[in-house]
Regions:
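Bacterial N-terminal signal peptides that target proteins for export
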Residues: 2-13, 229
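Cap/lid segment of the alpha/beta-hydrolase catalytic domain
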Residues: 74, 112, 121-193, 239-240, ...
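Glycine-rich nucleophile elbow surrounding the catalytic serine of serine-hydrolase chemistry
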Residues: 126, 203-213
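A catalytic-pocket lid/entrance helix-loop region that shapes and gates access to the active site
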Residues: 169, 213-215, 220-323, 445, ...
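Alpha/beta-hydrolase fold nucleophile elbow
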Residues: 194-205
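Short beta-strand/loop motif that positions the catalytic acidic residue
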Residues: 408-411
Length: 524
């Protein structure tokens, strides 16, 4: 007797469901078996299958930071509930003083064959879990590390972990990232039975520097690296972060106020922004801004809308950045035009905490070091001699580029970190890294974006798809569409243009739509 068609379909559906359940069970068993996996200098502490939507996102400052849309590697306003994955956590002890935590997340279903390494931020000490989840949602196996210390503890706050712990400083500088990558690749091969076909790194700020260090020290680790706002060279970058407070603190008699800095910022915006940029609140191309503080010098009595001669001189020094008094060398560029208001917190001579920690704990191993005695020749050069070999990245990345790997650099023009330094580094990179660098490195300067995210500009773009398309298909990015997200909604799109080009309105169409802009050569 012939069975009804509906019965046959039901039987097929039940059979497929049984097969799927069996496959899921095998995947979970394979995950659990990773707990017994032997890794050099490592102990696997967790190997568990996580069901869809069942992962409780840990709360730490980096978790909250990574939840901003501009920090999402896939350029999404938010990440959703987790897909099913195998969570592996391990502790690495390559030295007697090391205590590196790593996590590797392996999709139970739909792995795309690739690895995504996720960078940290500031002084590290925790993992960027939302960034890991964003990669997981795209089918990537993802990996992260706490860089070798726990920022939730008193001794792990800021740079204090480095005090008396040279091995932990090495872990922070490069060892944690490299070993995380090595072990992630081993776990991928053990779990899926084959190696990852590609490996990408995405990070900003410290995460951007971590990416550059990986490219320099371990050129085989990653096939594509997205390095946002890398503070390189780190010592000179942090010296520049101390410069405004040091300078303003020594010249309190000049009476530079937050209100005056805000006034200068508005004047620079008015002088150098395009009509659209003026309305949206940022300068498209500060590099070609010809505003000078002398234009605001008081003609007579000082008012709220002008600068005294002393204030003009201070502004000139803040723009220039710190210089070595012996050689006349600019140590690091100062504030970019239009960002003067970012200096308001330093008018009373305050130190930038992250930068202060670098000199106190990492370089000089002295918690009582008095930063106001900083010598812009001897102090900076001594710190460079101590930390440069660990944390500075030179301009020769030929071994990375010669194997076909790609590097995407970006920084926001509304960042406290002046984008001019990254332009200078990019140019030296093209000069010193051989012919392959011309086709394998790109720089994007993002108008109106703050430090890695935020600001009035469009700060959200799909970094992951961009680097993947470049590596897999050889499509070098020249124009990337970015979004401004407010309350979970896209309110504006703009093209990001590969330097030296900038986006210009074509004269017609919606000014809030990327389609109304073309990438053109920058002009003054």
């Amino acid at each position: 007797m012939k069975q009804p068609r509906s019965t046959s379909r039901r039987a097929v559906a039940i059979g497929l469901l049984a097969l799927a359940m069996a496959a899921q069970a095998r995947a979970e068993d394979t995950c659990s078996a990773l707990a017994a996996r032997a890794l050099p200098d490592a102990t696997i502490t967790v190997a568990e299958a996580i069901a869809p939507g069942q992962y409780p996102m840990p709360e730490n400052p980096l978790t909250r930071l990574a939840s901003f849309s501009g920090m999402n590697p896939a350029g999404r306003p938010a990440v959703g509930p987790n897909p099913a994955f195998c969570r592996v956590a391990a502790t690495l002890r390559p030295s007697s003083d090391s205590d590196i935590k790593i996590e590797v997340w392996l999709p139970l279903n739909g792995w795309n064959g690739k690895l995504l390494g996720v960078g940290s931020f500031g002084w590290g000490g925790a993992m960027m879990y939302p960034a890991m989840l964003a990669g997981l949602e795209q089918g990537y196996a993802t990996a992260a590390t706490d860089t070798g210390h726990d920022s939730s503890t008193e001794e792990g706050k800021g740079g204090q972990f480095a005090l008396g712990h040279p091995e932990k400083l090495i872990d922070y500088a490069w060892r944690a990232d490299h070993l995380m990558t090595v072990h992630a690749k081993e776990l991928i091969k053990a779990y899926y039975g084959k190696p990852a076909s590609r490996a990408y790194w995405i990070g900003c700020s410290l995460g951007g520097l971590e990416g550059l260090i990986e490219a320099r020290r371990f050129p085989d680790d990653y096939d594509g690296i997205v390095a946002g706002a890398p503070p390189n060279p780190l010592v000179k970058f942090n010296a520049a972060q101390l410069w405004p407070g040091w300078l303003l603190g020594r010249h309190r008699d000049v009476n530079m106020t937050k209100a005056k800095l805000e006034m200068v910022s508005k004047a620079a915006l008015k002088a150098c922004a395009t009509p659209i940029g003026l309305k949206q609140g940022f300068i498209d191309d500060p590099q070609h801004c010809d505003f000078e503080p002398e234009q605001l010098q008081c003609k007579g009595t000082e008012t709220a809308d002008c600068l005294t001669a002393g204030q003009v001189e201070l502004m000139q020094q803040l723009y220039r950045g710190p210089i070595n008094p012996r050689t006349g060398e600019v140590i690091f560029p100062g504030v970019a035009k239009g960002n003067e208001n970012l200096l308001g917190d330093f008018v009373d001579g305050q130190a930038f905490p992250v930068a202060l920690d670098l000199f106190k704990y990492a370089a000089f191993q002295d918690p009582d070091w008095d930063w106001t005695t900083l010598d812009w020749d001897k102090t900076v050069n001594e710190a460079v001699s101590k930390l440069g070999p660990l944390l500075h990245v030179g301009s020769d990345l030929a071994p990375f580029f010669d194997r076909g790997a790609k590097l995407l650099l970006y920084v926001g023009w509304n960042d406290f970190h002046n984008g001019q330094e990254l332009i200078d580094y990019y140019q030296s990179l093209l000069r010193d890294s051989g012919p392959a660098a011309q086709a394998s490195a790109r720089l994007f300067l993002i108008p109106g974006m703050g430090h890695c995210y935020g600001g009035a500009g469009c700060d959200t773009f799909d970094k992951l798809a961009t680097i993947d398309n470049w590596v897999e298909h050889g499509v070098a990015p020249q124009r990337i569409v970015a979004s401004k997200v407010e309350d979970g909604e896209v309110v504006r799109t703009r093209p990001l243009c590969a330097w030296p080009q900038v986006a210009r309105y074509v004269g017609k169409g919606d000014v809030e739509d990327a389609g109304s802009y073309a990438c053109v050569d920058a002009t003054r």
